[in-house]
Amino acid sequence: IDYRKCQASQILKEHGMDKVIPLPELVCTMFHISGLSPQAEV
């Protein structure tokens, strides 16, 4: 599990740069914000 990628995506989204984040990154961010483990998707 790479939480750093999730956190990086969240930071980018907060700065309005979420449009440049690939879909998998955005999904990872949404899981992170929701408090769910990214593993749940697998």
Curated annotation (Swiss-Prot):
One of its GO terms (biological process) is lactose biosynthetic process. Coiled coil: none annotated. Its main location: secreted. It comes from the Eukaryota. SUPFAM superfamilies: Lysozyme-like. It is found in: Secreted. This is Alpha-lactalbumin I.
